[in-house]
Amino acid sequence: ISGMPAVGKTSVSHQVARSLGTPMVGGGDVLKEMAVEEGYTPGGEDWWDKGDGMKFLQERKRSADFDKEVDARLLKKAKQGDVVITSYPIPWLTKDGIKVWLSGTVESRAVRMSKRDGIGVTECKEILSVRDRENHMLYKKIYGIEFGEDLKPFDLVVETDSIDESRVAEIVIRYVKGRRD
């Protein structure tokens, strides 16, 4: 499951994994493990959007090795069997699996992020604009991916602006079960 920051990937992925009885692994979780290996102390969903998290993301831009290692670890987990993975680039890096893109405007994602992180919607829009731009540049540089623009790898695209995360999860679950039958 992929999509722009704060579109609901993690929440939806947890619901999908629980319903399908499979483990869930997040690219952010693996990246946080690597941040710990680098001496950081990540914590909370909003860690990326504040002090140390943003500093780590800046350091990460100096070398593609961080992201390539995260992606290698996720691809390894994917090859082990049924698993729900949240990741920005993995859908472009493998032909295997059912690939889902969650779509949402900056406005709806900012509202979601504001509720989650307890910061103002305007500040969230600014943070998301920076993250969106940086993710696009990063994955273009590392893999040649037009992140957020090229949706060809995806089997299912779900627009999340007008429906809640539970409904998004239901749509994904129904699609996955239909593909399994």
Where are these regions (language model features)?
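Small-molecule kinase domains that catalyze NTP-dependent phosphoryl transfer to phosphate-bearing small molecules
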Residues: 121-171
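P-loop (Walker A) phosphate-binding loop of NTP-binding proteins
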Residues: 4
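ATP-dependent small-molecule kinase phosphotransfer cores
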Residues: 29-93, 107, 119
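ATP-binding Walker
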Residues: 7
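Hydrophobic anchor at the beta1->P-loop junction of P-loop NTPases
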Residues: 1
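Walker A/P-loop
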Residues: 10, 28
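Conserved phosphate-donor/acceptor-positioning beta-strand/loop module used by diverse small-molecule
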Residues: 95-131
